[in-house]
């Protein structure tokens, strides 16, 4: 349930970023990391629902954690002339060349959940996992009365 809510929140942020200054988008290509995880399944569903609501064409491709496939999918989006590419990178460094090529073609790029390293994008929508870990640690400490042992598996 939490993951579905998070996916909706993330996509709401993505939708807002897309609609800010590019409301006339004719097409969006989304390359997601996987569909083997409930988070990404929910994210894809939320994206499709929002695109339908906004009347925007959306093509979702699934990289299946394969960088070569993701790069080919992004290349396909560039060839099709989409206005926006949303990507959850398989490899934060490996997607740099594809993002650069998309940007040179005038396509806005938004990264979701996983940031791209060493390249600026239109927007990054994600969580602060470090802060989340700190909050989880604080909750565990409170739950055991600030003393005891905790194992993370």
Short names for language-model regions:
Residues 2-9, 18-153:
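A residue-level marker of the well-folded mature domains of exported/periplasmic proteins
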């Amino acid at each position: 349930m939490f993951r579905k809510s998070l996916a909706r929140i993330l996509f709401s942020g993505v939708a807002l970023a897309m609609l800010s200054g590019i409301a006339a988008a004719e097409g969006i290509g989304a390359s997601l990391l996987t569909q083997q995880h409930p988070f990404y399944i929910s994210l894809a569903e939320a994206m499709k629902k929002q695109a339908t609501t906004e009347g925007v064409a959306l093509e979702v491709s699934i990289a299946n954690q394969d960088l070569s496939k993701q790069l080919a999918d992004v290349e396909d989006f560039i060839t099709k002339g989409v206005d926006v590419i949303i990507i959850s990178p398989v490899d934060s460094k490996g997607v740099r060349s594809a993002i650069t090529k998309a940007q040179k073609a005038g396509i806005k790029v938004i990264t979701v959940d996983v940031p791209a390293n060493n390249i600026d994008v239109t927007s990054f929508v994600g969580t602060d996992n470090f802060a989340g870990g700190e909050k989880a640690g604080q909750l565990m400490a409170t739950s055991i009365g600030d003393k005891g042992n905790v194992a993370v598996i």
